[in-house]
């Protein structure tokens, strides 16, 4: 009778690989399992080899992003909803910078392309709500707006994660996103209020350790 796979072993190896990326350690079959208590055979059992490890790492970034989206409470304000979505994207990148980098490594195949692409649909749905509520022009494609706000957030957090700029740069998300959504047809004052609310929605309460992950200072 074949032994059942233990999900904890798979998670352990993925987390070790992510940690090795963070510490700039070369990842090989032997170095990956070193100190884990499992043999090199586990890499083949759970991933089919090192190529599978890289695919799983890339997929894991999208999996965690999707899980974060699932925790969001949908507000009545559709613009706040849209911005809260990209704020969640930013926080996910800040909390998992190594997985974030691998997410966009096109040289590595994804395990589930559709699941990865589905993460964008959260933003598309929110952008569609904006149009239905009359906050943006009726002739504007929600997919276009979703891509525009994602591009802004991706650019900002990429600079921060790569340490080109400090976390103070995150504060620029408010005026930049406001400009994008106002250009799409929203009222400037209402838009600013909604963007500020959405951008702040993912900040943990004061006193929690996670506060450091979302601080703009």
Annotate each language-model stretch with its function.
Residues 8-17, 32, 57-61, 65, ...:
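Generic hydrophobic, amphipathic alpha-helix propensity
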Residues 59-82, 114-118, 129:
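Amphipathic alpha-helical linker/stalk segments
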Residues 70-99, 142, 146-149:
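Hydrophobic alpha-helical connector segments
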Residues 109-135, 143-151, 175-178:
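Amphipathic alpha-helical packing segments from all-alpha helical-bundle domains
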């Amino acid at each position: 009778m074949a032994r059942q796979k233990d999900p904890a072993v798979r998670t352990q190896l993925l987390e070790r690989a992510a940690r090795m990326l963070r510490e700039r350690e070369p990842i090989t079959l032997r170095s990956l399992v070193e100190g884990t208590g499992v043999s090199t055979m586990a890499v083949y059992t759970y991933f089919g080899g090192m190529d599978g490890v890289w695919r799983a790492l890339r997929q894991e970034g999208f999996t965690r992003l999707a899980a974060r989206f699932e925790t969001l409470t949908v507000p009545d304000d559709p613009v706040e909803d849209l911005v809260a979505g990209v704020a969640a994207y930013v926080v996910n990148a800040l909390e998992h910078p190594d997985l974030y980098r691998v997410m966009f490594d096109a040289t590595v195949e994804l395990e589930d392309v559709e699941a990865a692409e589905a993460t964008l649909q959260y933003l598309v749905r929110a952008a569609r709500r904006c149009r239905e509520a009359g906050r943006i022009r009726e002739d504007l494609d929600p997919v276009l707006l979703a891509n525009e706000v994602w591009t802004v957030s991706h650019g900002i957090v990429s600079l921060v994660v790569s340490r080109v700029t400090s976390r103070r740069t995150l504060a620029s998300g408010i005026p930049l996103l406001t400009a994008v959504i106002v250009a799409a047809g929203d009222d400037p004052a209402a838009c600013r209020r909604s963007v500020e609310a959405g951008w702040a929605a993912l900040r943990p309460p004061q006193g929690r350790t996670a506060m450091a992950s979302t601080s703009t200072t």
